[in-house]
């Protein structure tokens, strides 16, 4: 185990050339205290505004007067900020580099070409009746047209809801229903790790539950022969050239919605996280520039899918708002071999690489030779996102990929935060393996105990943020009360992150994981209630409880306790059926790693399942189960311990 004491100082040459060095970081901290309005105004001023904002911040976390507004009288367009304003100087510069699933498949889009594609798709949407404020569901593979679709929506003021390509038809339908989307953009199929993903077939299945969806715009990607529904389905390649290559950007108020992105909560139904136009883009743009210390002409590669917030903020909006070059990768880290990531870095001369600990742990297991046989000399900065990175993986990343020279920005943030909140700055922050380090200037984290009392100094507690920042989500779509209750009612006057955290004597923050009923599997947030609901929907299952447990590769695995209906035999075949069932109901990433048959579950006399005990059994911490005397039937625990499934 690495001690808190292991520190990697900022390299002198990097500090010298960085956008923000230690002195600039300290100056920003001082300024945000002395002149917060000026500080936040300057962050907004990095964007092009049709009408610059004069009202910078209007925020109250109080229940009786709850509101979050940033730059509320400003007017701008996100698409124009990501494309049009760069055209005079960067029309022929590469905006997007594409690397396909199969090696040897790659292409580029310049800012001029991106402008044309976005305008044409925006005009197709308008021709099909999509208007400002309409919700558009996007279910696409990791290809440049996914970014084009998002930017086309932003151009005309439509609100995009991107659904990850790994979600099942039922999950897609739930997301379409929740935001009452009438228009879907998809592809015939996706490619991933040498396999085909039946995107259009999944949409067709989902839309059986959403008959109000009037139009589906399908991109021919693999060329698969897929059925088209007359009057509903339109093929992008058939209509692209029928519309103008120019589409004026729609002026949008800073607080107009930009997108909805669904994320798992501690209750069953996913939440539609709503981000707005001005504050979100200002924060995504500034954090990209500051944290990645981005310099013109560099190739930036974030491996996240656009179906997740990391793909929104740091594949599309952050890089393009800065006039950068962003790499979009269709494939997976280990196809066709575990050298693939490193080959892509070499091939495209990637300067900044941002990936998830899950991928690093899997590649670390394959051995160093897959990395070292490639030329990674183009790399300048490494990043980690999605879950806490264990110190062993951090040190491997630093030693083998970074040649013991490159800084690692271990970034902590959430779908709800829009962009990074706690992270090193490469030119300013000494690094501790496994620590997200310190908050960005203007971000106000605190640790609290269960009663909400502030904990000072070196301590451990629940992580809250005591004041707003521009990228903060504004509401849960269609359920503002759920927004308040989920994030602001546990600790009144503070945003509750749902994460536990430790702070050391140097003020560095170490994220310890979720403290609510949410687990983080390979950087994907999954609500345990969602998986439990899927299991209980199976005809053989009477009851289910799901917890996370430590997993060598994924960070956390899914451990399910399942009580079968009377007369149903517990067999290995049924266990496999239940795993496939969850894959079908939610998606492959939610499939249980372990299913333990449970004749009964540990419940209090009021009927509440004691998940704390289930977590301890799953983690094999059998000596610390705690007091079981309050359970209705303590003998249930003995049975679960005796029949614990191996992990």
Curated annotation (Swiss-Prot):
Molecular function as annotated in GO: acetate-CoA ligase activity; AMP binding; ATP binding; metal ion binding
Record's keyword annotation contains Acetylation: yes
Co-factor requirement: Mg(2+)
Annotated InterPro entries: Ac_CoA_lig (IPR011904), ACAS_N (IPR032387), AMP-bd_C (IPR025110), AMP-bd_C_sf (IPR045851), AMP-binding_CS (IPR020845), AMP-dep_synth/lig_dom (IPR000873), ANL_N_sf (IPR042099)
GO process annotations (BP): acetyl-CoA biosynthetic process from acetate
Mod. after translation: Acetylated. Deacetylation by the SIR2-homolog deacetylase activates the enzyme.
Post-translational modification N6-acetyllysine, affected residues: 608
Catalytic activity field: acetate + ATP + CoA = acetyl-CoA + AMP + diphosphate
Swiss-Prot/TrEMBL keywords: Acetylation, ATP-binding, Ligase, Magnesium, Metal-binding, Nucleotide-binding
GO cellular component, one term: cytosol
Purpose of the protein: Catalyzes the conversion of acetate into acetyl-CoA (AcCoA), an essential intermediate at the junction of anabolic and catabolic pathways. AcsA undergoes a two-step reaction. In the first half reaction, AcsA combines acetate with ATP to form acetyl-adenylate (AcAMP) intermediate. In the second half reaction, it can then transfer the acetyl group from AcAMP to the sulfhydryl group of CoA, forming the product AcCoA.
PANTHER family: ACETYL-COENZYME A SYNTHETASE, ACETYL-COENZYME A SYNTHETASE 1
The name this protein goes by in its record: Acetyl-coenzyme A synthetase
Organism the protein comes from: Caulobacter vibrioides (strain ATCC 19089 / CIP 103742 / CB 15)
Gene: acsA
């Amino acid at each position: 185990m690495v001690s808190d004491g292991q520190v990697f100082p900022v390299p002198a040459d990097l500090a010298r050339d960085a956008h923000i060095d230690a002195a600039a970081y300290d100056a920003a901290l001082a300024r945000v205290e002395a002149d917060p309005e000026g500080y936040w105004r300057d962050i907004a001023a990095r964007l092009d505004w049709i009408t610059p904002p004069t009202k910078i911040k209007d925020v109250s976390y109080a229940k009786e007067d709850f509101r979050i507004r940033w730059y509320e009288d400003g007017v701008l367009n996100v698409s124009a900020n990501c494309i049009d304003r760069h055209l005079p100087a960067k029309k022929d510069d590469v905006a997007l580099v594409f690397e396909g699933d199969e090696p040897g498949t790659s292409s580029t889009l310049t800012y001029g070409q991106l402008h044309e594609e976005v305008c044409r798709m925006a005009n197709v949407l308008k021709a099909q009746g999509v208007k400002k404020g309409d919700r558009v569901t996007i279910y696409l593979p990791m290809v440049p047209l996914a970014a084009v679709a998002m930017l086309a929506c932003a151009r005309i003021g439509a609100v995009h809801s991107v659904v990850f390509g790994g979600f099942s038809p039922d999950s897609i339908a739930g997301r379409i229903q929740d935001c009452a989307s009438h228009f879907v953009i998809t592809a015939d199929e996706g490619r991933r790790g040498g396999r085909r993903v039946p995107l259009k077939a999944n949409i067709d299945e989902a839309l059986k539950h959403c008959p109000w969806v009037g139009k589906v715009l399908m991109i021919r990607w693999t060329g698969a022969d897929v059925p088209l529904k007359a009057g509903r389905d339109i093929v992008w390649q058939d209509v692209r050239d029928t519309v103008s290559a120019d589409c004026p950007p729609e002026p949008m108020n800073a607080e107009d919605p930009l997108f909805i992105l669904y994320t798992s909560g501690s209750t069953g139904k996913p939440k539609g996280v709503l981000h707005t136009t001005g504050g979100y883009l200002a924060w995504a743009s500034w954090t990209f520039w500051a944290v990645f210390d981005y310099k013109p002409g560099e190739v930036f590669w974030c491996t996240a899918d656009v179906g997740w917030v990391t793909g929104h903020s740091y594949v599309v909006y952050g890089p393009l708002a800065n006039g950068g070059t962003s790499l979009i990768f269709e494939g997976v880290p280990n196809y066709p071999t575990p050298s693939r990531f490193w080959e892509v870095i070499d091939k495209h001369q990637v300067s900044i690489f941002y990936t998830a600990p899950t991928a690093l742990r899997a590649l670390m297991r394959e051995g160093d030779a897959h990395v070292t046989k490639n030329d990674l000399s183009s790399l300048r900065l490494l990043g980690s996102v999605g879950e806490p990175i264990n110190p062993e993986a951090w040190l491997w990343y630093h030693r083998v990929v970074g040649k013991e020279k490159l800084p690692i920005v271990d970034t902590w943030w959430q779908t709800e935060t829009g962009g990074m909140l706690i992270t090193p700055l490469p030119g300013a922050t000494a690094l501790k393996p496994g620590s997200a380090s310190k908050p960005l200037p203007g971000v106000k984290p605190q640790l609290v105990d269960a009663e909400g009392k502030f904990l000072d100094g070196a301590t451990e507690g629940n992580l809250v943020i005591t004041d707003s920042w521009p990228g903060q989500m504004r509401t849960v779509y269609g359920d503002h009360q759920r927004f308040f209750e989920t994030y602001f009612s546990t600790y009144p006057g503070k945003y509750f992150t749902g994460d536990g955290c430790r702070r050391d004597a140097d003020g560095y923050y170490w994220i310890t994981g979720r403290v609510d009923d949410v687990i983080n599997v390979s950087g994907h947030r999954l609500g345990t209630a969602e998986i439990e609901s899927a299991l209980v929907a199976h005809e053989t299952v009477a009851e289910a409880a799901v917890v996370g447990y430590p997993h060598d590769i994924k960070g956390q695995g899914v451990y399910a306790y399942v009580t079968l209906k009377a007369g149903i035999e517990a067999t290995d075949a049924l266990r496999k059926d239940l795993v496939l069932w969850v894959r079908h109901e939610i998606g492959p990433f939610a499939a249980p790693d372990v299913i333990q048959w449970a004749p009964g579950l540990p419940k209090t006399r009021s009927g509440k399942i004691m998940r704390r005990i289930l977590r301890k059994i799953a983690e094999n911490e059998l000596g610390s189960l705690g007091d079981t005397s309050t359970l209705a039937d303590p003998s249930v625990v003995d049975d679960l311990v005796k029949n614990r499934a191996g992990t």
